[in-house]
Amino acid sequence: MTIMNIQYIVECLALLREKKPLVVNITNYVVMNNTANALLALGASPIMAHSQQEMAEMMSFSGALVINIGTLDSVWTPRMHFAVEQANLNNKAVVLDPVGCGASQLRTQVARQIAEAANKLIIRANASEVIALAGENAQSKGVDALDSSDSAVGAACYVAQKYQCSVVISGETDYIVTQDAQYKLNNGHAMMPFVTGMGCTHTALTGAFAAIGDESGVVATAVLGVAGEIAAEQSAGPGSLQMNLLDTLYQLDEETLTRRLKLTVNA
């Protein structure tokens, strides 16, 4: 795994816009529009494919698979498992968003099953979800975290080892735990959690960068954090933030990303 630095992150943004990778999303009803538009604004190509009948074809030519369990049910679960099998067969990364893990036994069980099955895995979650994945007691209110991101770093280290993956913890401070290093990013804005699907957007962008290279979640976290920060400065509230975020992702340039990014690496 490459140790990420600001120059590498900037180069990945340029490469994504050049390659325009296709990202397969099995995601929830609430955020499909948000995440598809964010992927398009950044320069990727989203497809919201949920049918098991076409998944083998989709994974043969796409760049990565995003699985979001936000509106989980008995119909979606086998489709998700089959999609992971196809991603493994095609050596594609799987980005898992274990929405509400810890809030119900079903969500926790399915999240762990997917994490166990995926060969090339990145987990993007809030602190409570990461702690629940690790098997510890977490405080959650539905799909929202009541634990702070820094309190979940130890659990993230355990999860990263258990599933041989990278773990992205979203919060006031974002943390990424890989097999080789830990990263801390201090971008973003306090208004961002008031837009539904912001974490799901984070997961989708992680899938886009995973489709073009050696992504662990650091690049997507950096890009969304800086873009969200800029968009919030131009917004009166969550409604305008949602629109301004798309514009900022579309307009984000290398100089702005380099200048504003607050990244700490512990290798």
UniProtKB/Swiss-Prot annotation:
Cofactor: Mg(2+)
Gene3D superfamilies, sorted: 3.40.1190.20
Similarity remark: Belongs to the Thz kinase family.
Domain of life, source organism: Bacteria
EC nos: 2.7.1.50
Reported function: Catalyzes the phosphorylation of the hydroxyl group of 4-methyl-5-beta-hydroxyethylthiazole (THZ).
Pfam families: HK
Recorded catalytic activity of this chain's protein: 5-(2-hydroxyethyl)-4-methylthiazole + ATP = 4-methyl-5-(2-phosphooxyethyl)-thiazole + ADP + H(+)
Protein known as: Hydroxyethylthiazole kinase
Main EC class the enzyme belongs to: transferase
This protein's encoding gene: thiM
InterPro entries: Hyethyz_kinase (IPR000417), Ribokinase-like (IPR029056)
GO biological process: thiamine biosynthetic process; thiamine diphosphate biosynthetic process
Keywords: ATP-binding, Kinase, Magnesium, Metal-binding, Nucleotide-binding, Thiamine biosynthesis, Transferase
Entry-linked HAMAP family: Thz_kinase (MF_00228)
GO molecular function, a single term: hydroxyethylthiazole kinase activity
Pathway: Cofactor biosynthesis; thiamine diphosphate biosynthesis; 4-methyl-5-(2-phosphoethyl)-thiazole from 5-(2-hydroxyethyl)-4-methylthiazole: step 1/1
Binding site for ATP: 124, 170
NCBIfam families: PRK09355.1
SUPFAM superfamilies found in the cross-reference section: Ribokinase-like (SSF53613)
Organism lineage string: Bacteria, Pseudomonadati, Pseudomonadota, Gammaproteobacteria, Vibrionales
Organism: Aliivibrio fischeri (strain ATCC 700601 / ES114) (Vibrio fischeri)
Binding site for substrate: 48, 197
Spans through the membrane: none
